[in-house]
């Protein structure tokens, strides 16, 4: 009983993040979508104001602030996966992933976002991703 109470207190103190996903239909080729997810110029068109890359470390710039993430894996025309450096330094296993999904029956495409947020921030995080994905759709005309 005491151990359970201690675990609950630890979870409250660390505010563990919960995984969530969003699937967003986008009418575009896999190549165009992948380019928008994986290159500095592509990301700067919809995700951030600018991005600087040094090896696998991406520095994303938004309205004068910056966040740094490491590209941990990618597969051409399928997905890119990043970990925020701050989360990495804190020993957290959180990441965010941008994945291209193609429905084999209809050929329709979607971008699937996987991300993590604190429970009380999930809705805000989803709304932010949806706004970003609407920017992507506008940029590529899909």
What are these regions (language model features)?
Residues 2-52:
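Hydrophobic ligand-binding cavity/cleft-lining segments
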Residues 19-20, 31-32, 108-117, 141:
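Short, charged low-complexity linear motifs
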Residues 33-34, 43, 71, 82, ...:
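Hydrophobic pocket/interface hotspot
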Residues 45, 91-95, 120-127:
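A short, polar/proline- and glycine-enriched secondary-structure boundary/capping micro-motif
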Residues 53, 61-110, 114-118:
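Hydrophobic-ligand binding "helix-grip"
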Residues 116-142:
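A conserved amphipathic terminal alpha-helix motif
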């Amino acid at each position: 009983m005491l151990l359970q109470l201690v675990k609950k207190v630890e979870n409250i103190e660390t505010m563990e993040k919960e995984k969530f996903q969003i699937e967003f239909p986008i009418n575009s080729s896999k190549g165009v979508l992948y380019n928008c997810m994986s290159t500095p110029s592509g990301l700067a068109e919809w995700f951030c104001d600018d991005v600087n890359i040094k090896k696998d470390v991406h520095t994303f710039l938004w309205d004068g602030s910056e966040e740094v993430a490491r590209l941990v894996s990618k597969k051409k025309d399928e997905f890119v996966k990043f970990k925020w450096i701050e989360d990495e330094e804190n020993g957290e296993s959180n990441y965010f992933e941008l994945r291209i999904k193609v429905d084999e029956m209809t050929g329709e495409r979607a971008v699937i976002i996987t991300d993590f947020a604190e429970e009380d921030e999930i809705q805000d995080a989803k709304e932010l991703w949806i706004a970003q994905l609407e920017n992507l759709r506008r940029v590529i005309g899909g």
